Amino acid sequence: MSAHTYKKFENSTSGDLPDKMTIYQDCMNTFNESPVNSKRCRLLISRLLRLLAQGETFPQNEATALFFSISKLFQHQNDPLRQAVYLAIKELSGISEDVLMATSSIMKDVQNGSDLIKPDAIRSLTYVLDESTAFSAERLLKSAVVSRHPSISSAALCTSYHLLPISEVTIRRFTNETQEAVLDLKQFPNQHGNSEYYPNSTYISQYHALGLLYQLKKTDKMALLKLVRHFSENNSMKNQLAKVELVKIVNDLIYRDPQLFSQFRPLLSDWLSNKFESVQLETAKLITSFATRNSRLVAPELYAAAISALQSLLTVPRVSSRFAALRILNRISMVSPEKIVVCNPELESLINDSNRNISTYAITTLLKTGTSKNISSLISTITNFIHDVSDDFKIIIIDAVRTLSLNFPQEWKSILNFLIDVLKNSEGGFKFKNSIVEALIDIVSFVPQSKELALENLCDFIEDCEFNEILVRILHLLGKEGPSAPNPSLYVRHIYNRVVLENSIIRSAAVVALSKFALTKNDPTLYESIISLLKRIANDKDDEVRDRATIALEFIDSARNKDDVIAQNLIESKYFYDIPSLESKLSSYISSNTDSFATAFDVNQVRKFTEDEMKAINLKRKQEQIFNQKSETTLDTTPEAESVPEKRADANSFAGPNLDDHQEDLLATKYADELLSIEQIKPFGQLVNSSRAISLTEPEAEFVVRGVKHLFKDNVVLQFNITNTLTDIALDNVSVVCTPEISDEAELEELFTLQVDRLLPSEEAACYVAFKKLDEIVMEGFLNNLTFTTKEINPDTNEPFDGDEGFQDEYEIDSIFLNAGDYVKSSFTGNFSATFDELPCEEVAVFNIQEDLSIQEVVDKIILNSSCLPVESTQFAPSDSNSHTLKLFGKSALTGSKVALQIKMIKSSKGLALKVHGKGEDSLLCSDLVNGLMQ
């Protein structure tokens, strides 16, 4: 039937849906006619299915009436019509009542129907059977599973798979038949007679049978092992999807028990050379993802073979295979870029691939494999390419280059020249240009030696920039960084041009930027010029511009002639407020208004950061984004990836909580607010530092406890967050007894303990133990016991029974350690080597770690213990090297004194040797941090 004839009741060029009520009435009338017009019925069913496919639905009573009318068409022996009927039954069964009435008609077709409609009838059983009626189809399904016809067998296996959650007992009765179907090479009738009506068999029933068999045996590890051994022998699998499923079963097994990997090594090696590209891809994906989590169990030869297989797939004609191989290599490049350097020639050839998804993936993968030796050549390779792609792909490439600039700050010149070239010479929209400017801002912030060149080029760019938002950002950057540059007068001319030539939004931003140059110490002669310009601008016709110029003049006069510190800070800000904390405090201030705002908002209660601290926070967040990307590459390939639980806000990990930055900052503010609201702790003064929360019990324990260390100038407060997971027990008088490990030489004096009066089931509360420090820096370990009185809960009142005195008990929890890292905050330095050489105090220590830890695991532990900021991207240890140097920088949370660590690591058969070289302004902090680094 031609498409024109089939669609004669619709406008073939229109996307409009047919009227729902018209279709309903036509169906009800036509399906009940006698004799049945099969051609007309098929047409109406197709129009009905189109409605349902587009999201239209019918009320339950109308859907049920349609279902009954359609079920009458079972009496017609036209096979094409019956096929359409089964499609309609499938769609209507979810919104109709009493669908079981069609079961007998479907059963007849399953038993006596032709080979054409029998598979459709079997598939529709899924939608009409329930737990009470599924057993009636057992015999029919069992015989269909072992049918010699591939379509019938596949339909029965798929139906059984979908009935498994409904009636598992019934489906388990034909496990043996399912296992036979895996090895049975089913073929269509007359396949060898070259009949035009039957295609060659793809043996898809093997895949369906194996999928069902896995679901039946997935809880039995030994059964799965036997299944893999049995089906991997003698090349019995002919269908490539079945072979891919077998690889996934192996992946599931080694995910549960990594020690099984050695048993499958020969099999995996054989699969890497399989004739099917999909099998090679799935096997390479399995090996590389497993190696990310268990590198010691994967032989270098096998890993190299997996990379070689992916490398060969980069040159195959099939686009999907090239893309899949490239995607796996891209994931590897996030974790171990050095291992795919051998693929660079193939990756470079894909840069000009006609498929832009492939070409973009190729270039971003190449950039991730960059080292200090080949960055220049990579940048030159993509310079011409980037001008020929769309903005979306350009942004992806710029983001990759931005990451490269953070990983290799010493190569800033070639990266900066590339970004400037693209910014000036490439056409693109706002998002593209903004991504380049963000990358340049990162380079200026985190690579100080690049500042002068970057700012000069940005000055040239704003002369022709068409985007207001980007102009405002660049003007803000010039106002922030320009006054401290060697030649600040260079930027004043460009900024003033914007005041003269642009609209009010740009001119307002330019006035603010211009005012910041008045107090620059690098060129005091600028003062008179800036004052003259601002006085001229103060007569501007636009009030936004005029007001800013007027207030800037007032601030400058107060700061220069009256030594007004507040005015000077407003012009040259030395501190940055914690924005999430400020937002939270303002929201609380507005919502708790009791005196019509007679009491002014106290900005001193908001956390402030110095410029170095702010840069350290921003750099650490960017590093954690890269770290999280690497973690995702391992999660994406595990069988349980979708069920990985979300981390708590106070989870303990180097990479930080699995939250956005806003929530993470609010957590620190929450701690400070809770402590300052406690009367006994208020006299301690301002909170200096808080640690990350540390798990002190197992997550599945009866009482889940997490500890947080809070540091004040002369005091230490230990906070214990306790969760009662028992459902019928309440805890009274809950407290933690903290005993210093070295009690006879304790440098802490316990002041008080704040207990929790009552902790009901599923509730969480905090108890506190406060100490007075006898020295400025105290390092101590605490043995902890949770003490409480248990009382049984009355389920009617959800309170303990009256008169129940309870039972006193205690619960030992893990120790908590106060170390030197708790006295340190992350801080940023643009030139680590120069800063390290300038610091006066020095301390050296050597450690020999006997535990079987990788260099990366030790790096993570050191960063967590020291609380310092890793610089020059040394937080990522190369996986193919036995040595690494970690560089850390921080400041004392108490005094602000600088401390820097340079840690050299060498791994050998005897263990891991560490040489820690620390330098700082405070000899005591430097010594304690170096010597207590591995505690």
From Swiss-Prot:
Pfam families membership: Adaptin_N, Coatomer_g_Cpla, COP-gamma_platf
Range of residues in the leader sequence: none
UniProt topology in membrane: Peripheral membrane protein
Location of this chain's protein in the cell: Cytoplasm; Golgi apparatus membrane; Cytoplasmic vesicle, COPI-coated vesicle membrane; Endosome
Residue positions, PTM Phosphothreonine: T638
Record-listed Phosphoserine modification sites: S643, S653
GO terms under cellular component: COPI vesicle coat; endoplasmic reticulum; endoplasmic reticulum-Golgi intermediate compartment; endosome; Golgi membrane
The keyword Protein transport is annotated on this UniProt entry: yes
Keyword Cytoplasm (UniProt): yes
Family designation: Belongs to the COPG family.
Oligomer and partners: Oligomeric complex that consists of at least the alpha, beta, beta', gamma, delta, epsilon and zeta subunits. Interacts (via C-terminus) with GEA1 (via N-terminal region) and KEI1 (via C-terminal region).
Function: The coatomer is a cytosolic protein complex that binds to dilysine motifs and reversibly associates with Golgi non-clathrin-coated vesicles, which further mediate biosynthetic protein transport from the ER, via the Golgi up to the trans Golgi network. Coatomer complex is required for budding from Golgi membranes, and is essential for the retrograde Golgi-to-ER transport of dilysine-tagged proteins.
The protein, known as: Coatomer subunit gamma
